[in-house]
Amino acid sequence: MSAPSEPRAGRTKGLVVDLSKAGRTKIRYPAELVRDDGVRVTVRAPWAAPGARDFGFVRFEPGDVLTEHYWRDRWFAVKEVRTGDGRLKGWYCDITRPAVLADGVLRVEDLDLDLWVSADGAKVLRLDEDEFAASGLAGRDPAAAGAAARALDELEGLARTDGLTALLG
């Protein structure tokens, strides 16, 4: 576990988020370290993919800002998504292996399962369960597959109560 750190007032600390999937880097992008308490790492970054991406239930686009919460002891990441002018769109939650921060790189392995929670909390959508089943993780690493499934259930339970905002508070 790396030591807790918090940028001093007026100073920011940069790092790189390296999101991998099935052993390959999916995307790498620079982010500003907001807080690191030794367990949870919070970063802020603009939408990093080229152009807009419409998921049907939300549209991510240039100018959006994501405040991303990663845990060293939990199997998920929660990304608060806001427009450039600060309007909350919702929370995109990735099921991941616990995050590792070393040498300025935050490494996160995406395990296919996702959860979307709308800004008003009215929509809670489980996503990509078919991709997860097709990934073969349950056969290769049953313990990880079980942890991922439990993490999705935990996040959904938090999202359907006031638990998600309490978790991020």
Description of each model-found segment:
Residues 56-100, 106, 111-113:
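Phosphate/ribose-recognition catalytic cores of enzymes acting on nucleotide-derived substrates
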Residues 151-169:
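Cysteine/selenocysteine-centered motifs that mediate thiol-based redox chemistry or coordinate metal-sulfur cofactors
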Residues 111-154:
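A hydrophobic, small-residue-rich beta->alpha segment in the mid-to-C-terminal subdomain
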